[in-house]
Amino acid sequence: MSQVDNRNSSAAKRARTDGGRREDDWICPSCGNVNFSFRTTCNMRNCTQPRPADHNGKSAPKPMQHQQGFSSPGAYLGSGGPPPVYMGGSPYGSPLFNGSSMPPYDVPFSGGSPYHFNYNSRMPAGAHYRPLHMSGPPPYHGGSMMGSGGMYGMPPPIDRYGLGMAMGPGSAAAMMPRPRFYPDEKSQKRDSTRDNDWTCPNCGNVNFSFRTVCNMRKCNTPKPGSQQGGSSDKISKQNAPEGSWKCDNCGNINYPFRSKCNRQNCGADKPGDRSNGSPSRAPEENDQ
């Protein structure tokens, strides 16, 4: 007949990896598996050995085995207490930084304290939490913007976090917040207009220099004559073939064979006084 574990309802669940054994845990005499105290049978697969009858739940605890070179944390602390903080030396045998360890317990604390509590310049021996000895100016002191006090008078990272490691100026500056980079004001306030751009006298629209008429919708006002000489028309006055004519409405220069202005939204007729010079009329006049 298989036995069923009678788990105590008041016992809190505990993971296997939460630390070492507890006092009331028991070892299976068959397979050597360590079982929680609430188990009545071994939970090892294919074992189910019942708990020994002589188990009184108060066996001596076994300290955890530490690797060589590691210092033991001392007496076993229950799950309710916080883990110890090693202030007097490195818990791994040798110091990690600069070959020197942190200040030991019960050492007079010199210099300004960054905390608002009065410790009477001495911390109690064996205290787990205490302010680290910090070399350098106290935090939030007056000074230059990027001086020894850090950014905006903030202490350097070694003072703020108590890392206990030496940092060069480059490393400390890398951990600081970078100031915002603002480009030159001239690049931000760059003028949107160019020297050769022109303003429409009718609607006030600013046009690019290459435009000959205003590009504002339903405007099409020609470029003022004072600025038209430098514009790049399809047919300039210098390169216009003989017999070309200028539109009286928009000022566009048209080829001789055109009878109407080819400017968009213009379509004005060719002036009558110049119609006789058109090549299309020449054959008819010669025929007569």
From Swiss-Prot:
Pfam families: Zn_ribbon_RanBP. The lineage of its organism: Eukaryota, Viridiplantae, Streptophyta, Embryophyta, Tracheophyta. It comes from Arabidopsis thaliana. Residues 15-24, 181-197 have a biased composition (Basic and acidic residues). The modification Phosphoserine is found at S278. SMART domains: ZnF_RBZ. A zinc finger (RanBP2-type) spans 22-53, 194-225, 241-272. This is RanBP2-type zinc finger protein At1g67325. Residues 1-11, 223-241 have a biased composition (Polar residues). The keyword Repeat applies.
